[in-house]
């Protein structure tokens, strides 16, 4: 018994998808938009972190190198009346 070879089924318009070329402008725009949004989100997170707690962390680190935390930002504080210059090298 011979097997009948069926003719190929026709491809309808809604079944066929044109292959996308990786170098097309659509791919380039998609990459550009993805990178741009990624950078905006990264800058936003960095700004928010600086605003919320990094600024204070930097001041505390500077305070450890200098005198005390209360005296940060006020410039050179004068010596105390009892002559105690706490935190100054002798």
Curated annotation (Swiss-Prot):
Can you say what this protein is called?
Answer: Movement protein
Which positions, given as ranges, span the membrane?
32-52
Kindly state the subunit structure of this protein.
Interacts with the capsid protein (CP). Part of a MP-CP-viral DNA complex.
As for subcellular location, the record says: Host membrane
Output one GO BP term.
transport of virus in host, cell to cell
Grouped into one coarse class, the protein's main location is host cell
Task: State the annotated membrane topology for this chain.
Answer: Single-pass membrane protein
Q: Describe its function.
A: Involved in the viral transport within, and between cells.
State the InterPro entries in the record: Gemini_mov (IPR002621)
| UniProt keyword terms in alphabetical order | Host membrane, Membrane, Transmembrane, Transmembrane helix, Transport, Viral movement protein
Similarity annotation: Belongs to the mastrevirus movement protein family.
One cellular component term (GO) for this entry is: host cell membrane
Source organism phylogeny: Viruses, Monodnaviria, Shotokuvirae, Cressdnaviricota, Repensiviricetes
